[in-house]
A protein has these predicted regions:
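Gly/Thr-rich phosphate-binding beta-strand-loop-beta motif of the actin/hexokinase/Hsp70
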Residues: 98-128, 142
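Short hydrophobic/aromatic-rich motifs at helix boundaries and adjacent loops
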Residues: 41-44, 110-113, 169-172, 196
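Short C-terminal domain-edge/linker segments immediately following a structured domain
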Residues: 5-6, 88-90, 114-116, 137-139, ...
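Short His-Asn-centered micro-motif
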Residues: 87, 110, 215-217
């Protein structure tokens, strides 16, 4: 298809630039910013005629070892990959309907290791970005503050809807703390996470968006 040709052309250019450095890349997703028919912007080319058509899109690439590892895991579990995309693309398609994409909004999927960002404007997804800080930073702050292992820190996060949180530290001592105190101890880590994500949004968008949507387990804190 027209879009696929464009994405493959971008991949060829990327491979040519990185032949002697990072190896090959796989295109794992793309989104159309706009179609042009005879240099006029159009929502869809289907059913239209003209002398000149073009497409502007964003294509996302991952190093081949990363993609091959994903396929290897699926193969070991007897599963088959039918399609591959990025988390922010999937989240944006589910959560932000096309009519809302007319507004300049950012969607942030806060996972464990990364926070993936997608930005929409004028009906299209216009940028992607990634912050390398996410939910694990909160877990690590709990580990440092309360001298617990990773699994216990995760359990404490999951118990934070209760009025008090009970846990056992690495020395075997039992503790019970107020949930308000627990959240207060995490404010520095949460502020740092929010600041990092905000910087990446502004860098990708060029300015602060009209609204920010948060999804993913890390956003629940």
């Amino acid at each position: 298809s027209f879009e696929l040709e464009t994405a493959l052309k971008a991949q060829d250019e990327l491979d040519a630039e990185t032949t002697d450095t990072n190896g090959s890349f796989y295109c794992v997703g793309h989104t159309v910013i706009q179609y042009l028919l005879d240099d006029y912007k159009i929502k869809s080319l289907v059913g239209h005629k003209g002398r000149k058509v073009s497409v502007e899109l964003i294509a996302a690439f991952l190093p081949s070892p990363v993609v091959e590892s994903l396929y290897a895991v699926m193969d070991m579990n007897g599963l088959e990959v039918t399609s591959l995309t990025l988390e922010p693309i999937a989240a944006m398609n589910i959560i932000i309907p096309p009519e809302i994409r007319l507004i300049n909004v950012a969607l942030v999927d806060i996972g464990a290791g990364t926070s993936d960002i997608a930005i929409s404007q004028n009906g299209s997804i216009v940028a992607y970005a990634m912050s390398t800080v996410a939910g694990d930073e909160i877990t690590e702050e709990i580990i440092r503050n309360y001298i617990v292992d990773f699994a216990t820190a995760e359990e404490m996060k999951l118990s934070s809807y209760q009025e008090t949180i009970s846990y056992k530290d690495i020395l075997g001592f039992d503790h019970t703390i107020d949930t308000g105190e627990f959240f207060a101890s995490l404010f520095p880590a949460v502020d740092s996470l929010a600041e990092n994500i905000a910087e990446n949004i502004v860098k990708a968008n060029g300015q602060a968006p009209a609204a920010v949507f948060l999804v993913g387990g890390g956003s629940l804190i």
